[in-house]
Amino acid sequence: MQKTKCYLAALVSAVLLVTGILAGCGQSKKDDHLTVYLWENRLMKNIAPYIHEQFPDQDIEFIIGNNDTDLYSYFKEHGELPDIMTVRRFSGTDAQDLQPYLMDFASYDVVSKYYSYAVEYYKDTDGEIQWLPICAIPQTIIANKTLFAQYGIKVPENYEEYVQVCQQFYDKGIKPYSMDLAEDWSNQEIIQAAAIGEFTSLDGIDWRNKAETSAGEIKFDDVLWKRIFSETSQFLKDSHFSKEDINVNSNTGTQMFVEGKSAMFHGQPTDMQKLQDQMDAELIRIPYFSQTSDSSFVYMFPSLNIAFNKELEKNQEKLDTALDVLDCMISEQGQKLIADGSGVISLNTDVPSMMQNVPGLEEEIKDNSIYIRYSAQKSFDASLEAVHGLLSGKMDEMQAYNAFRSAMNSKDSKEKSTVNFENEYSISLNDKSGRDAASSILTTIREENDAQLALTPYYYYTSSIYKGECTSSRVGLMTAKNSDTPLYLVKINGEQVYELVKKYLTEADENFYVTTKYELPIASGMKIIVKNKENGFSLKDITINDKKIDTEKEYSILLTDTTKSILKKINPKCAIEQIGDTTLSSAWIAAMSNGQQPSAPEDYIEVEK
């Protein structure tokens, strides 16, 4: 990553001069502290360590977020907007309230590194660019090429041939396309992919630009949208989808494809690789075809969208650090990590697309025939309602369009508060390197499940607990809903508890381990005392009620996926019980649903030099 390395020397010296204004949620009082919110914990395990590696002398804290701009609206309401924010599902419409608080990228050099089509939908009516996409993930049809060859069926190269292919497989008793239409994102995909020629037309681009910047009701071009729903309906018929497909979830659709009961599925490059590992067949990707021309397009979405707090512009050195973090993300290696491997469409002119192992899309990539999905939050539910209406026969094309339009412009009902928090706890590190908000949440969940101890990674807790009334949806934003984890209970002795914590600090995950104070685990019911080493931390002691843990005594301990997997390595035969369908997020929401106060934070960690 040559560009990032070039900046490193300048950054190290610049950080010593930083003076400015604290801008992040729960940030430390040091002026050079930069807070970066990443929308899922996969990013905490790959891109965060990589950035730390590039900038070892920078004080950069990564905190888990959610795939919802409302999290940042919540922070903004309490005057604690982070320095850097990310989401995947994004539309300018969803972030209107944040607009006055976000930095405009338009005047910065970073925009010149993007292809024009990549920022086309990110400009507001004033020409400002407050969000930028970070690399693209193709979401296209995955075809079983071996099955095509077995039946002498040609892989389609245009929409007419696609229709013929579907009919040929249907006539042979094989489902042409098993799509998981029980999922909202697939219904959203099917509308935009079926009418991709309309969405990429001048009329479609014009509507999209207006919709992305609409501060109120989204205006619909009836002529355009009648065509869109006509083509959506036609695609459903041509693909031989029926009302039974309404209940096909991701697992069912995948299994049909793996077993050769369907000829086509859909997904990302990582999905294709997983399918390839399960199948003795050659797979190939097929783009989505326009119904109005011979054009074809790669339907894709950014791995993440990123925004900067406007306050960064008041501190040039800190802004330079933030821009270098962004530059690190859009480097070739950064994009590979963010996109989780191969199959990355670079949106940047100086980084090549990494599609060598993803056959079938060569011409579209070469011609930049790429469509970035429209992903306003309401469009997911609106798409599901409309497509299910068409499939069930309860709606014709016009009724489906009207339902979609109504859902997109529906008014959000005012949500009632479910709890009035009497105390405020910060998600930032306290003077002992603990997080009071995370401690409060975990202790509440532990006590609700009658466990004596609990140990979880730090990357399940997103927000401070703010004093005052709070709705259920905002309570839910305090934990990482988009990176949720089941909860487990197990009884082990004190020696095994000690070994569990020790292993967590050194080898929590083959791709992730604790290197900075920001990555230390969250514990409850016990206090872990750790020593700060040059390349991480080591466990010195564990106390319970100010006494050393009894190595022979049995304790019930609450675990998550990560801590459970570590325990399994230590003691493969231990009986670990999953707590039904309960997740960390659902347990927290349920605990607060009756208006009770959360448990007070515990003094659960101490770091010795």
Say what each PLM segment does:
Residues 130, 163-216:
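Extracytoplasmic/periplasmic solute-binding protein
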Residues 211-245:
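Glycine-centered hinge/linker elements that transmit conformational signals in sensory
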Residues 277-340:
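Extracytoplasmic/periplasmic substrate-recognition and gating elements
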Residues 53-117, 146-151, 157, 256, ...:
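Extracytoplasmic "Venus flytrap"/periplasmic binding protein-like
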Residues 414-609:
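Catalytic centers of hydrolytic enzymes
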Residues 43, 61, 300, 339-412:
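C-terminal capping/gating helix-and-loop segments adjacent to ligand/active sites or protein-protein/ligand interfaces
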Residues 88-140, 154, 163, 190, ...:
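Hinge/lid segment of periplasmic solute-binding proteins
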Residues 74-76, 82-83, 111-146, 175-181, ...:
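A structural signal for short loop-to-beta-strand junctions that line the ligand-binding cleft
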